[in-house]
Amino acid sequence: MSTTVGQVIRCKAAVAWEAGKPLVMEEVDVAPPQKMEVRLKILYTSLCHTDVYFWEAKGQNPVFPRILGHEAAGIVESVGEGVTELGPGDHVLPVFTGECKDCAHCKSEESNMCSLLRINTDRGVMINDGQSRFSINGKPIYHFVGTSTFSEYTVVHVGCVAKINPLAPLDKVCVLSCGISTGLGATLNVAKPTKGSSVAIFGLGAVGLAAAEGARIAGASRIIGVDLNASRFEQAKKFGVTEFVNPKDYSKPVQEVIAEMTDGGVDRSVECTGHIDAMISAFECVHDGWGVAVLVGVPHKEAVFKTHPMNLLNERTLKGTFFGNYKPRSDIPSVVEKYMNKELELEKFITHTLPFAEINKAFDLMLKGEGLRCIITMED
């Protein structure tokens, strides 16, 4: 590895040249890391709905050509000036949001929304100098959420890199750098269900099932899965879900159905769909006096949350969360340890594996709604 330090590395990357078109495998030049940056060799990456959303570019600013990808694991190849806590050979997870450790958010025990490195989906360059580290024939290829893991090598700000246990299998723990931690933390860190409590999970995709896994780990006795797709129910049992509600089966609002099932409402709910009606239902289905609802899904930009103020005055709590309230550098290593201690099971989230050359198949699988996480192996 050391022979490449300070040099431009030419490697393979899957480039999104335009919205909705298949990614193209290209030879890209990856510049050395600058001040407070790290160059990583990506070994495994997985596909998340966020990658597909920005590849389709239907509802936001299109930034192309771009190297997508943000859920991954790899090894540090080299570090830039000022980087002291990471070195070549370290095993790491790059994360789409960061932790500078200096701002008010990073110094707060309550927040993980770093002022410097908070996710910015429009920015396609490094914050240090406003330039891209990727190029083809001298022309820049843009970054994605500071990670761009659909490349054999990438450059990331040090604050967006979590150093993890070198014994952790990178082909499993790579899924912890985004969706699984988001759902898990929403339950464990924000909803905080107690042993024996009831929890409703709205949306049984990968993030929702991770939220259910959090409820299972916390010792919840009833985990009610809510989804319009009945085919997801069987799989959800593996994640601790005990009961299922399909809103299509009822003529009344799902919050009323859940209230009747649970003698007045669940103790906690976690909403993972981003649909505004589900968000309102998730809040209104929690028990008065102590119920807590946590919103995880990202709504449409025109969405408006409407509920009667009495629902709040009757001592229900509504919370939002970002990345499960985990600080990337400080907290994600301990989530990896949950897996290493067999407290958290990751294998059941991984339903497909593909070589890097077949990355477009991973997009097809997600667009068809097949499986949960597809691991893409970077090395042949």
Swiss-Prot record:
Cellular component terms per the entry's GO annotation: cytosol
Annotated GO MF terms: alcohol dehydrogenase (NAD+) activity; S-(hydroxymethyl)glutathione dehydrogenase [NAD(P)+] activity; zinc ion binding
Chain residues that bind an alcohol: 50, 70
EC class: oxidoreductase
GO-annotated biological processes: alkaloid metabolic process; formaldehyde catabolic process
Family: Belongs to the zinc-containing alcohol dehydrogenase family.
Protein name: Alcohol dehydrogenase 1
Species per Swiss-Prot/TrEMBL record: Solanum tuberosum
